[in-house]
From Swiss-Prot:
Pathway in which the depicted protein is active: Nucleotide-sugar biosynthesis; CMP-3-deoxy-D-manno-octulosonate biosynthesis; CMP-3-deoxy-D-manno-octulosonate from 3-deoxy-D-manno-octulosonate and CTP: step 1/1; Bacterial outer membrane biogenesis; lipopolysaccharide biosynthesis
Listed GO biological process terms: CMP-keto-3-deoxy-D-manno-octulosonic acid biosynthetic process; lipopolysaccharide biosynthetic process
Stored InterPro entries: Cytidylyl_trans (IPR003329), KdsB (IPR004528), Nucleotide-diphossugar_trans (IPR029044)
GO cellular component, one term: cytosol
Stored HAMAP family: KdsB
Protein name according to UniProt: 3-deoxy-manno-octulosonate cytidylyltransferase
Keywords: Cytoplasm, Lipopolysaccharide biosynthesis, Nucleotidyltransferase, Transferase
Major place of residence: cytoplasm
One Pfam family per UniProt: CTP_transf_3
Record's subcellular location: Cytoplasm
GO molecular function, one term: 3-deoxy-manno-octulosonate cytidylyltransferase activity
Length: 254
């Protein structure tokens, strides 16, 4: 646990059992390893993090992470979302943390270079308190589904809006459309402020918690990436897509 006390750049994977779309998702098997193990081991390949840890409120997940040799901490069941779970873990276990990356536990194919890029953004610009990745897409299924979040941003990289709808509307099809990838790098002090911002009308309407930041008048900056990630796991049927991707990345659409 010495790493907990000294780590300044921390990656945390919030994990819970009770997903409405896929109960028990963190322990679902993907080619012999669980989803949370694959996501954890993938995050470990980032060169910018001093420590990677799972934060959970479920004893089954905790025991499993410890069993495969990972670091895990228990958090309260009352956490309303993953960000609150991350903040609690940092507050209780990482007194020296300066940058905290909230890494989704259902993204086993996330490129570690994305994590590194976000950390570099915060280290290189003290004015940025929170950064998140986006990637351009021309996939009509990804553009049209409300399960994929779209983002528009200004010339400085400051996010203007996130939506489950198609933005921009793009009648002339000349403007790129960017998908949001749900990873966030926070400056430690701002993470504590973030969880205190109450839900806003737009965040509730879109079911996107990051919109509370924009509605409060604060800024989120985006990191534009290419060939960013493979399929994530939202539903049980996504397991086969991830397995196909891991076996042959070039032949899977998602």
């Amino acid at each position: 646990m010495f790493a907990f006390l000294t780590s300044k750049r921390v990656g945390i994977l919030p994990a819970r059992w009770g997903s409405s779309r896929f109960p028990g998702k963190p322990l679902a098997k993907i080619l012999g390893k669980t989803l949370i193990q694959r996501s954890y081991e993938n995050a470990l390949t980032s060169r910018s993090l001093d420590c990677v840890v799972v934060a959970t409120d479920d004893q089954r997940i905790f025991d499993h992470v410890v069993e495969f040799g990972g670091l895990c901490v228990m958090t309260c069941e009352s956490c309303a979302n993953g960000t609150e779970r991350v903040e609690e873990a940092v507050s209780q276990h990482f007194p020296q943390a300066e940058i905290v990356v909230n890494i989704q536990g259902d993204e086993p194919c996330l490129s570690p270079s994305i994590i590194d890029g976000l950390v570099e953004m915060l280290e290189g610009n003290p004015a940025i308190d929170i950064a998140t990745p986006v990637t351009e897409t021309v996939d009509p299924d990804a553009i049209l589904t409300n399960h994929k979040v779209k983002c528009v941003f200004d010339k400085t990289g400051r996010a203007l809006y996130f939506s489950r709808s198609v933005i921009p509307n793009n009648f002339k099809r000349s403007t790129p459309i960017y998908l949001h990838i749900g990873v966030y790098a926070f400056r430690r002090a701002f993470l504590s402020e973030y969880v205190k911002i109450p839900p806003s009308s737009l965040s509730l309407a879109e079911d996107l918690e990051q919109l509370r930041v924009l509605e409060s008048g604060r800024s989120i900056y985006v990191h534009v990436v290419q060939n960013a990630t493979g399929p994530s796991v939202d539903y049980p049927e996504d397991i086969s897509k991830v397995e196909q991707y891991l076996l042959c990345p070039s032949k899977v659409s998602f």
